[in-house]
Regions:
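Charge-rich, well-structured scaffold segments of protease-associated domains
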Residues: 1-39, 76, 107-244
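His/Glu-based metal-binding/catalytic segments typifying zinc-dependent metallopeptidases
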Residues: 39-97
Length: 244
């Protein structure tokens, strides 16, 4: 696309044991001849708040197993609340000891798969919880079981043990992601592109996550993860449409 794939909308990160003057010369040789594109105007469309549950069905001829998607509108990635939602995602579904996985997949054998994640975007983001049923489990049953776990987060502080586990997980992931030159280069590029050019986040991001408290987790869940603020999508095989 000539509008977006242009030098003035690209980020080049060079990391490593480099000769800086020589590197700048090579960059100029390879990239300077590429013409600048038009200035890109960016706008932020304000959406009306979701105040009632939106229910929808979608049919796909290429799937055999249905799925439930619960989607909530959440704030842009460069906010504290977005980071808190990342923590909630890890608590709910990251790893076999996470609350939803342990409950629905391991213990109750209701689900083939469950996931919770915040799709971070620049303006609004989308928090998604999805699950695939196992056996005779209905999508409505999965919704009820998922909502039960979300309500616990909204009404109770998570345990100190779980909180410390989350802290350790985020520290481990951050260190691992930046353990080599390629990881550092990728982080710097992402911070510049998605966080208003703030590459200092490579030194601050971990502390931002570690500053999130148990009360923050409860308050953010109360603010965004409400049943009247979401889309409830039943994603179904085409054959189920024909049966109706």
């Amino acid at each position: 696309n000539k509008k977006y794939y242009v030098p003035n909308n690209a980020i080049l990160t060079v990391a490593g044991d480099i000769d800086i003057p020589q590197t700048k010369e090579w960059i100029s040789d390879y990239f300077a001849p590429i013409p600048r594109g038009v200035t890109i105007e960016r706008s932020f469309t304000k959406e009306r708040p979701i105040t009632e549950t939106i229910r929808a069905e979608a049919y796909d001829p290429n799937i055999q197993i249905p799925a439930i998607f619960l989607a909530y509108r959440t704030p842009g990635r460069n906010t504290r609340d977005a980071r808190v939602l990342d923590v909630i995602s890890t608590y709910l579904s990251k790893g076999k000891s996470s609350k939803l996985y342990k409950k629905l997949v391991d213990n109750q054998k209701m689900s083939l798969q469950v996931a919770a994640f915040n799709m971070n975007n620049e303006d609004y983001s989308t928090y998604v919880i999805l699950s695939l049923p196992l056996g005779e489990t209905t999508l409505s049953t999965l919704v009820a079981e998922i909502d039960e776990e979300v309500e616990k987060i909204k009404n109770e502080l998570i345990s100190e043990k779980d909180y410390q586990k989350l802290q350790n997980q985020f520290e481990s992931e951050f260190v691992s992601a930046n353990a080599n030159i390629a990881g550092i280069a990728n982080s710097l590029a992402e911070y510049y592109a998605f966080y208003d050019g703030n590459t200092d986040l490579i030194n601050e991001e971990l502390d931002l996550y570690k500053s999130i408290s148990r009360e923050d987790i409860r308050q953010v869940a109360r603010k965004y993860l409400n049943t009247n603020q979401r889309l409830e999508l039943h994603y179904l095989p085409e054959s189920q449409k024909e049966e109706k």
